[in-house]
From Swiss-Prot:
It is found in: Mitochondrion. This is Glutamate dehydrogenase 2, mitochondrial. Its main location: mitochondrion. One of its GO terms (biological process) is response to alkaline pH. It catalyses: L-glutamate + NAD(+) + H2O = 2-oxoglutarate + NH4(+) + NADH + H(+); L-glutamate + NADP(+) + H2O = 2-oxoglutarate + NH4(+) + NADPH + H(+). The gene is GDH2. It comes from Oryza sativa subsp. japonica. Expressed in roots. Expressed ubiquitously in various tissues. GO terms for cellular component: mitochondrion. The active site is at residue 102. The keyword NADP applies. Its EC number is 1.4.1.3.
Amino acid sequence: MNALAATSRNFRQAARLLGLDSKLEKSLLIPFREIKVECTIPKDDGTLASFIGFRVQHDNARGPMKGGIRYHPEVDPDEVNALAQLMTWKTAVAAIPYGGAKGGIGCAPGELSTSELERLTRVFTQKIHDLIGAHTDVPAPDMGTNSQTMAWILDEYSKFHGHSPAVVTGKPIDLGGSLGRDAATGRGVMYATEALLAEHGKSISGSTFVIQGFGNVGSWAARIIHEKGGKVIALGDVTGSIRNKNGLDIPALMKHRNEGGALKDFHDAEVMDSSELLVHECDVLIPCALGGVLNRENAPDVKAKFIIEAANHPTDPEADEILAKKGVTILPDIYANSGGVIVSYFEWVQNIQGFMWDEEKVNMELHKYMNNSFQHIKAMCKSHDCNLRMGAFTLGVNRVARATLLRGWEA
């Protein structure tokens, strides 16, 4: 099942639990606007290249739409639509005043030079500048994009609308980015894990972890969990997978990786088959890479007691059912990986106020938002006698539905 079908399925289940009428249900599912633009740029060798860019603005009942822009060869309208819808529910679960959006350009960023990426970003911004804005739609980095991409968008947008730092989040600190933003998703994963384990009388300290993905989210999650006394016993990325039953030395591994080393070449670990990573014995499994990695083929062999969805849609619905029968507790993506969008909200607030926070305040506020969201999800689980995924979906959908009704948009 693709990401759009799975997200829509979860939404419909939540709508049924909430007893939404069919007209309201349909209006919540339909995107506010879908944008498709062609971006033609001169390449460094003088030839012209064309790329298709997308922006799906899903819902703005609770505030400006919010969502990342990804550069990836497999960006397509279905995927962007699913992720935009997911952002609507995610921002509502987090109780931040945003709706959902998502965008992307179908390209292979690794095959483009820095100057080509800049030209592509500026052309894309020129095509959508009148449809985004601090109080309309606020983009952020995603797969294949970063703070430099956001700096180019900010600059290009400002040529049309004047200096507007709040138009994007995930910017460089020197252009109004927030302290703590780089670590935010990984730190939020740690806070979410801490909250879930506490419910079961456990803690990060003394628990064993397997992490799939060692990019921004995975590396920060591993580092912060290690600092909290958790034992990361296996870890993998596109270069390979490694394990150490006594716990990997995460600071040493980070140093090795930052010096250009591949995971499989790390001295203090045993190389393992990557296909074994997700089914490795552990207390907590944290998928931080692509969607759909847990499926009906490998779900029966999963040995983790808890799964924290740091990636978007890492668990197929079929795997969800298998894991539930096995008694595995899954903390869903629309809550578990919301640390990034929460700190993006803090960045937006700081830009609008023109008053920057120190990192301690950012982390303290993030902790508060993650804890509050978890308690609200648990309350919905109790009210509707459902699992954590449906607890999160009913919480998010209910908040958006209430805002829609209050604004008189249901007709």
